[in-house]
Each structure stands twice: as structure tokens, then as C-alpha cells.
């Protein structure tokens, strides 16, 4: 009799189904039990980048971690170290940071502040395991500039730690510098600004925007302001792809797939789907490259933690927010060329208590105590009397900056705590909002240049911004200016600022004080009476100066072109002296120094 296919019995089918379900249940049980448990790696290898380095460079210890890796290396593993002078007189507690998505690489950096021998001990922790390493290195005096500090003798001003040179703060904004895909564009932007004697750039770490403020810029592959310090959540990414698939198949289901597809989109400021517990390593590595390039040119980078333009932030005071700040400190703190800025337009997304607490924490967490500030819209929210707050970062757009900065100096003196005064947002070239006070022409290169003179002649410092009209991802696509730092040869505003920098740094400006009462006709004067008189004449002409008797060298400077004209020795016997007329029209500066 021919054999046909056997028919499975119902009981056999039930047994097989039961076995499959049992295996599936066991797998789920194992996953549930062990999910989140951090097992130790099989081995950890430590390596040291340098045995000998200059003071204010940094040594880096790389930690290679084998599998099994921490489930989330940003929360489930850590690298910490103690660095000490060989004689044990000084110690620094330093945090390391994860530098790979899978947790296979950690790094810890240390910037030694002086020549000598140093030792260290580091510990990597993952789960219940601890792996340690120790070593030493030698530091030479390479005459490098260290971090900028407040001049202890002249507290309105800054000095470079290490060399003791004075730092003439001359800044610009380039908020989304690291939004460039091509690192060569970033390096070229820094180099160009450095050649224009810009020595400070405001760059955001986490700020994002979908507003372009009327400028001819747009997000595209080559540049975007939709920067991504964090990774997006895996589950949200899967939902997003599922939603996109439904859209492509033209499925509706009451708009469900449209809703799902929008559940995660890093380009969406309102719903980026960030997992605040995981950092996007490629973005932070790109930022490292920008900082290293700036470091080689003594360019200070003001690290603006976040911006009001971002529509989502980690919750104020949350573990996510503090993890972000501590990661930034661990990663970037060893660069000598940084300062901290708690946030742009800060008072619109954080209150004063947060500002005070967070500024204080940053000074506790940062082993190098880099200078720190904040940048609110309303200047009453600056924490000017607190120890953590090192200099002002005003936002004031009027075209009466000289009087404003003098008033701020007076207010600061009234607090019993002298710190440098800086206006870091008084306007951008070719960009002047309707709400700002100034009138037609207030956004021209010449108006901003003159405004910068008003600020520095009040003993203050300033940060300006170049035109963005040359376009980013919009033809001619050669600019970006204040938004991203890129520029071309048609952008010449900062050439005018160069002459101001040259004039101010030609004398010991930090030894002078505003003394407008010594000059007439609306002119401005910085003086150390009897030694230095630096005068700015907004409308050229002559100036009458109340001056102590003596012989002085005198030089006219064309504030617009940098042209210099030396006068014969000025011999003063009476308490007033009237200059000859300036050699030209427009604005001029006059410098008298005692022989």
C-alpha cells in the first residue's frame, strides 16, 4: 500500500507550540533579569600619549576596553584620575570621557600648569570591576600661553596665564561653526579670523535653530545649524523608519503613519528624539578638531553650552543636563583656549537660581577653573556679584555704547567686585532687528567699527559679528559670517577693527582708566595721567587736553585706515594743551606717551 504524508496529531502540535513558547519565555526571562546589568570587560589596556610635553599642552591617556562593553558607556562606566606634582604638593581630580559609541574607548586629559615632574593614577570602573593604571611624565616650560585669567593687579582686564601677557579681548560670533561638514572649512574660518586679529569666537555646543533671521542661509548637506550633541533614541528611530515605510506604501490608517514618521527627526527642533543619556561621538570629535585648530592660533573659544533658539533642552537641573555639562568639561577642559558661557539668551529658558547654581557647579567640576559667564537678553540676570562669574557678557544694541559701558563699570564698582566688562552682542553687520534702538545705518560696517571704539574707550571689551549676506547654501555661497564663521574677500569689516586693536595694543592699555573729563567736544580719553593719554576723536578736528606738564611723544592714528602720523615732541608746561588738527576727516585717535 503506498505511503502518504503523515498527519500530525493535535497533541504533538500542542507540545511543539508549548516548547516554542517556553523557550521564548525563557529568553524573555533572561533578558529581563540581565537587562541593564553591567558585566566587567575581559581586559582593559591603558596607553599614554606623551612622556614629555610643554606646560599648557595636555597629556592624554587612552583606555581600550574589551567586550562585554557597558550597556550604556555614558552612564554605566567611568574613567577617573588623580594627577599630582611629583612632590605631592598639588593634586587635580580629573574625569575622563567615553569616546566611542560602543564603550570600547575612553580617554582622560590633563593640562599641566607648570614645568616639572608629574604622576597620575587612573581607574576605569565598569559594573563591579575596577581596573587601574599609574604613570608619570615630565613637563617643560615651552613658554606657551595658558588659559586667560583676570589680571589681579588691574581687574578690569585679562592676562594669559603662563606668560603674563595681557589679552586684548576682540571677539566675534560663529555660533554654528561646527555645523560645517568639511573640517577644512572650519579650519579656514578660524585661520581667516585669526589673521584679522580676532582672538575670541563664541561657538555653541548644543544650540540649534530653524530660524535664519532673514539671512540668506539654509540648512543642507554642507552646513547645518541642526547640530547633534546627542544620539537619537533607538526605539524612536525604528518608529520613524516604520512610519516612513507606511508613508511610502501610501498607508493611512487615520494619519497614524504620518504621526509615527514625525516621532523622531533630528532636523525638527521640537521633536529631535534625542536620547540625552548618549552622546553623538562623531559630533564631539569634530568639535575637538575645531578647538585644536583654534588652540594652535591662541584663539579663545567661548563654549556656549546651549541657546534659547533650541526648542528642547534637557530638563533644568536634571541628571541628563548635568551629564552633558560634565561631559563637556571632561572632554574640553584640558584645552587652554576656552571659556564657559552658560547659555545664549539664557534668561528665556533658565532662571537666576539655575544660573547661580550651575555656574558654581561648573567651577567645582572644572579642574582648571576656566573663566565663565552667561549671556541673558536682559542684563539684570547676570550674576555679577558671585565668585563663579568672571566677566560680563552683555546684550545691548543701542548706539550709545560709550555711556552704557561707563555706567556698567560704575555699577560693577558699586557691587564691590571688579571684573572685566564686555558687550558680546551689540549688533551684526547688515543685520539690525526692528526692536533694536539705533536707526538707519546702525548695522553698517562703519557704524559697528565706531561702536567698537566707543566700547574700548570706556575700558571695556566687545564681540561683534560679520555679515551673513554672502550666503550659506545660497549663492554665492561663500559666506556665513556671524552664523558660522565663514567669510570671503568681500567681507572687510574686521579690517577696520584691526586698526583699533593695533592702536590699543601699542600702549599699556590695562594701566589706563576712562578720563573723558580731560578732553573736550565729545571726544573720549583713556589715561594714566602724566604717562599715557589715548584719545579718540569721533569727528576728527582738534582736541584740548588737560595734561600734566612734561615732554610727550605724540602720534596720530587714522582709525579707519591705520595710517600713522608722528608729531614732533610735545612739551607741555601749562595744564592744558590743544592739538593740531587731525590729518584728515572722519574719526582719528591720538596717543601721547611721556618720554
Regions found by a protein language model. Name each.
Residues 88, 92-155, 179:
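Extended acidic/polar, glycine-enriched regions
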Residues 42-46, 52, 72, 420-421, ...:
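Aromatic- and carboxylate-lined catalytic core of secreted/periplasmic carbohydrate-active enzymes
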Residues 41-87, 94-97, 137-140, 522-526:
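Non-catalytic, glycine-rich low-complexity segments
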Residues 107-110, 574-582:
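Exposed aromatic-hydrophobic patches
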Residues 78, 142-403, 417:
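Active-site mouth of glycoside hydrolases
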Residues 9-26:
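N-terminal Sec-pathway targeting helices
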Residues 26-47:
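Bacterial Sec-dependent signal peptides at the C-terminal "C-region" and cleavage site
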Amino acid at each position: 500500500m503506498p505511503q502518504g504524508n503523515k498527519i500530525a496529531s493535535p497533541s504533538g502540535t500542542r507540545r511543539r507550540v508549548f516548547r516554542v513558547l517556553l523557550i521564548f519565555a525563557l529568553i524573555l526571562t533572561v533578558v529581563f533579569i540581565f537587562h541593564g546589568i553591567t558585566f566587567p570587560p575581559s581586559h582593559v589596556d591603558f596607553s599614554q600619549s606623551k612622556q614629555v610635553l610643554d606646560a599648557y599642552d595636555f597629556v592624554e591617556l587612552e583606555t581600550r576596553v574589551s567586550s562585554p562593553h557597558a550597556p550604556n558607556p555614558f552612564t554605566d562606566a567611568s574613567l577617573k584620575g588623580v594627577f599630582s606634582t611629583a612632590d605631592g604638593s598639588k593634586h587635580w581630580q580629573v574625569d575622563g570621557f567615553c569616546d566611542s559609541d560602543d564603550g570600547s574607548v575612553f580617554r582622560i586629559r590633563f593640562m599641566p600648569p607648570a614645568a616639572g615632574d608629574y604622576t597620575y593614577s587612573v581607574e576605569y570602573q565598569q559594573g563591579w570591576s575596577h581596573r587601574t593604571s599609574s604613570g608619570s611624565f615630565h613637563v617643560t616650560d615651552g613658554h606657551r600661553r595658558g588659559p586667560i585669567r583676570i589680571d589681579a593687579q588691574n581687574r578690569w582686564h585679562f592676562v594669559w596665564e603662563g606668560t603674563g601677557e595681557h589679552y586684548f579681548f576682540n571677539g566675534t560670533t560663529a555660533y554654528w561653526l561646527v555645523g560645517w561638514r568639511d573640517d577644512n572649512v572650519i579650519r579656514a574660518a578660524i585661520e581667516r579670523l585669526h589673521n584679522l586679529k580676532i582672538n575670541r569666537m563664541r561657538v555653541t555646543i548644543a544650540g540649534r535653530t530653524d530660524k535664519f533671521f532673514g539671512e540668506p542661509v539654509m540648512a543642507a548637506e554642507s552646513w547645518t545649524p541642526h547640530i547633534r550633541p546627542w544620539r537619537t533614541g533607538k526605539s524612536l528611530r525604528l518608529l520613524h523608519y516604520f512610519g516612513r515605510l507606511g508613508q511610502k506604501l501610501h498607508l493611512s490608517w487615520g494619519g497614524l503613519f504620518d504621526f509615527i514618521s514625525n516621532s523622531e527627526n533630528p532636523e525638527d527642533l521640537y521633536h529631535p528624539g534625542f536620547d540625552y543619556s548618549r552622546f553623538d561621538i562623531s559630533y564631539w570629535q569634530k568639535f575637538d578638531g575645531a578647538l585644536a585648530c583654534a588652540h594652535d592660533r591662541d584663539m579663545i573659544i567661548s563654549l556656549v553650552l546651549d541657546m534659547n533658539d533650541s526648542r528642547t533642552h534637557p530638563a533644568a537641573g536634571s541628571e541628563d543636563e548635568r551629564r552633558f555639562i560634565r561631559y563637556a568639561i571632561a572632554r574640553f577642559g584640558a584645552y587652554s583656549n576656552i571659556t564657559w558661557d552658560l547659555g545664549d539668551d539664557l534668561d528665556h529658558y533658565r532662571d537666576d537660581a539655575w544660573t547661580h547654581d550651575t555656574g558654581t557647579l561648573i567651577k567645582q567640576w572644572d579642574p582648571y577653573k576656566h573663566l565663565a559667564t552667561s549671556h541673558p537678553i536682559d542684563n539684570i540676570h547676570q550674576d555679577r556679584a558671585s565668585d563663579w562669574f568672571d566677566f560680563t557678557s552683555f546684550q545691548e544694541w543701542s548706539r550709545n555704547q560709550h555711556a552704557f559701558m561707563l555706567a556698567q563699570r560704575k555699577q560693577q564698582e558699586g557691587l564691590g567686585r571688579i571684573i572685566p566688562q564686555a558687550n558680546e552682542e551689540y549688533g551684526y553687520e547688515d543685520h539690525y532687528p526692528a526692536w533694536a534702538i539705533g536707526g538707519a545705518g546702525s548695522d553698517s560696517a562703519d557704524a559697528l567699527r565706531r561702536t567698537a571704539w566707543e566700547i574700548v574707550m570706556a575700558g571695556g571689551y566687545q564681540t561683534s559679528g560679520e555679515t551673513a549676506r554672502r550666503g550659506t547654501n545660497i549663492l554665492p555661497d561663500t559666506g556665513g559670517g556671524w552664523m558660522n564663521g565663514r567669510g570671503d574677500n568681500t567681507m572687510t569689516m574686521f579690517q577696520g577693527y584691526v586698526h583699533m586693536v593695533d592702536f590699543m595694543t601699542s600702549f599699556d592699555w590695562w594701566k589706563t582708566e576712562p578720563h573723558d573729563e580731560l578732553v573736550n567736544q565729545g571726544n573720549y580719553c583713556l589715561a594714566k595721567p602724566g604717562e599715557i593719554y589715548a584719545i579718540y576723536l569721533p569727528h576728527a578736528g582738534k582736541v584740548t587736553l588737560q595734561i600734566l606738564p612734561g615732554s610727550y611723544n605724540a602720534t596720530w592714528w587714522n582709525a579707519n585706515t591705520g595710517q600713522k602720523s608722528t608729531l614732533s615732541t610735545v612739551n607741555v608746561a601749562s595744564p592744558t594743551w590743544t592739538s593740531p588738527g587731525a590729518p584728515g576727516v572722519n574719526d582719528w585717535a591720538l596717543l601721547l606717551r611721556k618720554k
